[in-house]
């Protein structure tokens, strides 16, 4: 049976283009479109779509407010369609925290001219959103309310070197999962490096958002940054990030290079470098995400002596990357998101 999609966008042009693109795939049926939240509400009640493609900026009621109502009254998997701008990034994170499964960034140019850039991604993500774990998404949104409270900022010092290192990879659902996990880290947590699949315009905003909520320092990585205790470095969008040993320190190195496992930044690229340069002093964590990026790299980390943790299926929005890692024997521990920080602390205490 085809995936039944409702498109909600105030632009008639956007509605037409999105419908034309999605209708090209035989597994997707666009059952209706709506110009605003009020028309969309009636369509949802009447048609009960499998997936809603929702524009962020709309008249009468903005996309975030409407999204919250959808999650409360008509829980349905939602794919946000947002502009790739600084403001667009902030609103997109609001949407993900409010319950959206994922997002697609609208083309910079005229949507007619730029639709080819996102056609494959749009179709792929509609299918992924349709099969996602909506109950885990709703629980994650609830957990966000209790977890993401302001915490006093620890003062980071470059003198705080780290001999242990935590490497984390995530994709779909990862922004909320990372926020919940990193909010539990303290100033004494070993240095953390993160790859979250995200466009280049979004990663700095994401890091700043986490930094305002967490005790540890969170920043978008810059080439040559030192990895230190109480510090979390997030790989910039569209750049690979690797770890290198530099005397008594670990540093990150950024570069372009080809996409690996379909992504740049790639979790596999990060994990492979951690396996080579950190070995048994590392802990690898693979969170919710579509695809297989990070699985082979995690296996290499495990082979090098690192401990490895995968998020469990029940708490994952999309159990893709962790599942593949588990299936190839790369995972030591499968944990719910709420217990991953506890497992990390336990592993660190064992290795003192």
UniProtKB/Swiss-Prot annotation:
Subcellular location: Cytoplasm
PTM annotation, UniProt: Phosphorylated by CheA. Phosphorylation of the N-terminal regulatory domain activates the methylesterase activity.
Annotated Gene3D superfamilies: 3.40.50.2300, Methylesterase CheB, C-terminal domain
Residue(s) carrying 4-aspartylphosphate: 55
InterPro entries: CheB-like (IPR008248), CheB_C (IPR035909), CheY-like_superfamily (IPR011006), Sig_transdc_resp-reg_Me-estase (IPR000673), Sig_transdc_resp-reg_receiver (IPR001789)
Catalytic reaction list: [protein]-L-glutamate 5-O-methyl ester + H2O = L-glutamyl-[protein] + methanol + H(+); L-glutaminyl-[protein] + H2O = L-glutamyl-[protein] + NH4(+)
Gene Ontology annotations of biological process type: chemotaxis
Keywords, ordered alphabetically: Chemotaxis, Cytoplasm, Hydrolase, Phosphoprotein
Top-level division of the source organism's lineage: Bacteria
Active site residues per record: 171, 197, 293
GO function term, MF aspect, one: phosphorelay response regulator activity
This protein's record includes keyword Signal: no
Enzyme superclass (EC): hydrolase
NCBIfam families xrefs: PRK00742.1 (NF001965), PRK12555.1 (NF009206)
Protein name, as recorded: Protein-glutamate methylesterase/protein-glutamine glutaminase
Record organism: Sulfurimonas denitrificans (strain ATCC 33889 / DSM 1251) (Thiomicrospira denitrificans (strain ATCC 33889 / DSM 1251))
